[in-house]
Amino acid sequence: MSAAGQGYWDANAAALTFTHPLNLDWLAALPKAARILDYGCGYGRTLAELAAAGWTNAAGVDFSAAMIERGRAAGPTLDLRHIAGLPLAEPDGAYDAVILFAVLTTIPDDDEQRALMAELRRLIRPGGLLYVSDYLLQTDARNLARYEAGAARHGVYGVWDRDDGGVFRHHTREALDALMDGFGLIAEAEVETTTFSGAKVTALQRVARR
């Protein structure tokens, strides 16, 4: 992530609430001691849910130091780690499962998205799980106008700019298919979630096996 991107999340860390629902049933086959990584964990919301459900070996990493500080203050027992970039200082196959919630939306660049997915594949053991939740292209007039303006500015349809300087991306199913190529799909569902501004949007959730 660029320095500008990291600065955006640091500046907004105190105010943001993340809402993508965590379907614990999709993780039910994992032992409670399974090694779980929440990549792009923010302030640790999903880690707290995992801990409350009995998982004891989950860690979260994020580029935003302010997000990590917020999470540590609210949940001092959570394993929250600030990272500077890729690759992570972890061996191949270090994790039984990786959670990737609303992270691809924060990465407008194709090459950066592919680099992240390659790194997550490296970190997941053979047979391990990848649980992705991210925004699909929306069909309302407001977002369609954003996509048109974003395509003119960034050269990619689905990339758009927030008024506060944030740059985000929504995806086609085909784009998510390509990013998850080589993983075996186990389950998927469309879910309704809300944006930072409170707008209701549709996200696609998938759990797949490496």
Task: Specify the residue positions occupied by each region the protein language model found.
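A short glycine-rich, Lys/Arg-flanked "PGG" loop and its adjoining helix->strand segment in the class I
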Residues: R114-P126
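A short SAM/SAH-binding and catalytic strip from SAM-dependent methyltransferases
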Residues: A97-D111
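Non-membrane alpha-helical structural segments and their capping/turn regions in soluble enzymes
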Residues: A65, D110-M117
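A short acidic, Gly/Pro-enriched loop at the edge of an enzyme's catalytic core
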Residues: L86-V98
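Class I (Rossmann-like) S-adenosyl-L-methionine-dependent methyltransferase catalytic domain
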Residues: M1-A34, Y39-P87, Y131-R210
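Flexible, active-site-proximal loop/turn residues at the rims of small-molecule/cofactor binding pockets
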Residues: L104, L116, L136
